[in-house]
Amino acid sequence: MAKITKTFQYGKHTVTLETGEIARQAGGAVIVKVDDTVLLVTAVAAKSAREGQDFFPLTVDYQEKFYAGGRIPGGFFKREGRATEKETLISRLIDRPIRPLFPEDYKNEVQIIATVMSMNPDIDGDIAALIGASAALSLAGTPFKGPIGAAKVGYKNGEYILNPTVTELKDSQLELVVAGTANAVLMVESEAELLSEEVMLGAVTFGHREMQKVINVINELTVEAGTKPSDWVAPAKNDGMIAALKEAVGDQLASAFQVRDKLQRRDAISAIKKDVLGALAPRATIEGWAAGDLAKEFGELEYQTMRGSVLSTKVRIDGRALDTVRPISATAGVLPRTHGSALFTRGETQAIVITTLGTARDGQVIDAVSGEYKENFLFHYNFPPYSVGECGRFGAPKRREIGHGRLAKRGVLAVMPTLEEFPYTIRVVSEITESNGSSSMASVCGSSLALMDAGVPIKAPVAGIAMGLVKEGNDFVVLSDILGDEDHLGDMDFKVAGTAEGVSALQMDIKIEGITEEIMKQALQQAKAGRLHILGEMAHALTTPRQELSDYAPRLLTIKIHPDKIREVIGKGGSTIQAITKETGTQIDIQDDGTIIIASVNAIAAQAAKSRIEQITSDVEPGRIYEGKVAKIMDFGAFVTILPGKDGLVHVSQISSERVEKVGDKLKEGDLVRVKVLEVDKQGRIRLSIKAVEEGEGVQASAE
């Protein structure tokens, strides 16, 4: 195939799609150029599904090569290692709008690899990767019901910005990524500075409207490349098997879905499945029905039963009305030795959230393609298997845990203090101890309480809620605070976090086409009502940050010195700073601009270290009297330490008003004496006098 190139203007950027020259053995391969940021995105689909495959094995890997930024990786091996958090999050970002566009029965393995090969640090690779994945899949001839487009939306001064740069995002009140087909939005990921629901919805519709040019260009590229449609055909339904299964199940599933407790309901459904499949086993053997096909159709009956019941009765499987939030319990300060903690329970979803305060040196150093930087707010989400009553792998966080942690972090970012306002590194950990839907939003609520319990001056409490949707034709219902089953069997997972004032984070994943602006508007309005209700319940535990830090949290004192004085504080070979930290038991961080941060669990020790530093950096004042210690005896006088690191000479003629024949007759090393500063010359040498003090001149000052 000859090289094909398509170029179009997308916001302020020129986007170029190229195919036919690179990675020609891949099913589909596209070079995506957004100014100087260049990605190679490939898509390969297996010719057939593996024997017994019962799920769609789609994998997406986004990777940023260090050579793209002209850097060599750090570490011993000097090559890229496992996926970073950013790479994992963008991989998920690509997966989410693509997965629902494959047919339900398609089980062939599909792999998408997006490689950043050149990076302009001001143009991130996420949107280019989404565009490239859509184009590569369209070229690969898979049964992909795309293409999709993607756009990033910023918001400043009341106006939306299409595909803002990294620099522009620093001043933007919004960072929103939206992806979808020509007719429908499929995915939204965003963080915002407490914006209204109307502004958020406007950003989604703005992005969807602008991305149409991407979809049009990909369609043109596919036509020019002569891509053949997929020849995959969905397996025919076995009507006889389905009818027999429905007859055997009867109304048992409808009864099981009336059980309110999650585990009891799950056990009841499992028992029905076991009995029904057992009863049908003899006929299945005769008819040649596969056990996997029977199990799959049983799952389809579950899907239809739950959805039909909710649509017809407007009552949910746990007995709630459509807009009712589950019972909430919230407690702050549940763990005695942590810096801040909270227990948040909503129905059968529960999180213990812990906040830990550290110093600047506790921040995480990120070695990125664009350069090193430090992250001083960390949010980690853990989802152990016991939280859903199961056994499972336990260890390093999976992609889902990384994604949920990032979403919860987005939820509270808008209310966090700056490092200047609160100079601590903050780590929040959410331990999910029970889960039945919306555990990431429980993490948002719990983190808000844990941060306030730790004394972090957040601007306002934050709550989060997950919304769901059941839609058949034109009939639909929006569900507030969804259960796990409602998420699994529903058409939408729509998470919203924010304060009473506005939205701080919004994430939406839609499994079907046809989600209208009306549906999104209703979901946002219902989410706001739910969020305000949850904030009211959380207020029973804590409404404002505690005024005092935990007894076990480090106290930070910040002082500012002239940068020229830094070497005096550090001392020769670090001797001075080491002596201060050892004697006071504190931790001291010195920044290049002269900012010094002193950390200690003991406030008195921190104050002592501060006093020492102030003494070292203070200037010696001529005419002032100091109390010092004799450091060294010489024939011509004595050197006296009047401030840490500052010695002056008392000449033999200045020791006493009487004649002194031998310095050692009057002074000994270690003696404490009061001296007056006569002069500090241009070389910084200090002339002192004991005689002048005895004569009563000067103003007294003391120093250790």
UniProtKB/Swiss-Prot annotation:
EC class name = transferase
The EC number(s) attached to this protein equal 2.7.7.8
**What's one GO BP annotation on this UniProt entry?**
RNA processing
Q: Which cofactor does it need?
A: Mg(2+)
Where does the UniProt entry say this protein principally localizes?
A: cytoplasm
Any one GO MF term held by the record is: 3'-5'-RNA exonuclease activity
Q: Which reaction does it catalyse?
A: RNA(n+1) + phosphate = RNA(n) + a ribonucleoside 5'-diphosphate
Q: Which Pfam families match?
A: KH_1, PNPase, RNase_PH, RNase_PH_C, S1
SUPFAM superfamilies reported in the protein's UniProt record = Eukaryotic type KH-domain (KH-domain type I), Nucleic acid-binding proteins, Polynucleotide phosphorylase/guanosine pentaphosphate synthase (PNPase/GPSI), domain 3, Ribonuclease PH domain 2-like, Ribosomal protein S5 domain 2-like
Q: Where in the cell is it found?
A: Cytoplasm
* CDD domains noted in UniProt: KH-I_PNPase (cd02393), RNase_PH_PNPase_1 (cd11363), RNase_PH_PNPase_2 (cd11364), S1_PNPase (cd04472)
Name any GO cellular component annotation.
cytosol
Q: Note the InterPro entries from the entry.
A: ExoRNase_PH_dom1, ExoRNase_PH_dom2, ExoRNase_PH_dom2_sf, KH_dom, KH_dom_type_1, KH_dom_type_1_sf, NA-bd_OB-fold, PNPase
Which of UniProt's keywords are assigned here?
Cytoplasm, Magnesium, Metal-binding, Nucleotidyltransferase, RNA-binding, Transferase
**According to the lineage, what is the superkingdom?**
Bacteria
Does Cytoplasm count among this protein's keywords? yes
Domain KH residue range list: 554-613
- Its signal peptide is none
Specify which residues bind Mg(2+) according to the UniProt entry for this protein.
487, 493
**What residues does the S1 motif domain cover?**
623-691
Query: How is the subunit organization of this protein annotated in UniProt?
Result: Component of the RNA degradosome, which is a multiprotein complex involved in RNA processing and mRNA degradation.
Described by its record, this protein's role is as follows: Involved in mRNA degradation. Catalyzes the phosphorolysis of single-stranded polyribonucleotides processively in the 3'- to 5'-direction.
HAMAP family, A to Z = PNPase
Q: Which NCBIfam families match?
A: polynuc_phos, PRK11824.1
Which family does the record assign?
A: Belongs to the polyribonucleotide nucleotidyltransferase family.
Kindly provide the name given to this protein in its UniProt entry: Polyribonucleotide nucleotidyltransferase
Which species is this record about? Xanthomonas axonopodis pv. citri (strain 306)
